[in-house]
């Protein structure tokens, strides 16, 4: 055997040993991943959602399963029914626990419930909606209610605001709202910030979150991600810009409490390799 052949042989041998050892170590790891959007319902049919498909979460789930890890995936039902999920055959993997949800409240309950288990890493890639419908109303009805209040002498800011935030003219949303309401309005309210609870629930896990802004300077994106990391006691935030995504550039950056870590990602594979390195370095 030539010297070059010898070198190549030993290189491949060492590489194989490292891969086998890495897989054995990964088989001991438990990973929790959230993916896709959340759905907030206006009535029994209409909903508020976002553009997230859950692809990143599915890709990460696939990679971790291939390495032998045990994965819990919390995602909307649309993610579990997606072509990519079926393409990878994830539904038949015994190491995958799928937890279907719809709303932010559902995901909150699922995350809280799963915290009774021990996880090495939590990757919170779900695009959780910031707002949810509180109630719907017809603008004509609200105008009538406000006019009556003014007639009754209720003209202070606090009195008007009280009617606006809790009117008597709410539309019943227990069934489908009529399709012929020309002036239907929906009052939104904030959803629970799930990222704020992760460290309380998963004290010993590596926590990775995400931050998406649109068309901002890179320095601003990094600073917002850094502050998010500190505020919620996360280990890392992966930051990206919607402008880049729309241009077909899947560019994102790794940030921790100290700021940008000089690590760029250009694909889900890149994110997985970093996550893998992090989780294999813990005992």
Question: How would you describe each model-predicted region?
Answer:
Residues 26-283:
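A cross-family phosphate/adenosyl-ligand binding-site feature
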Residues 2-5:
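Serine residues within intrinsically disordered or low-complexity segments
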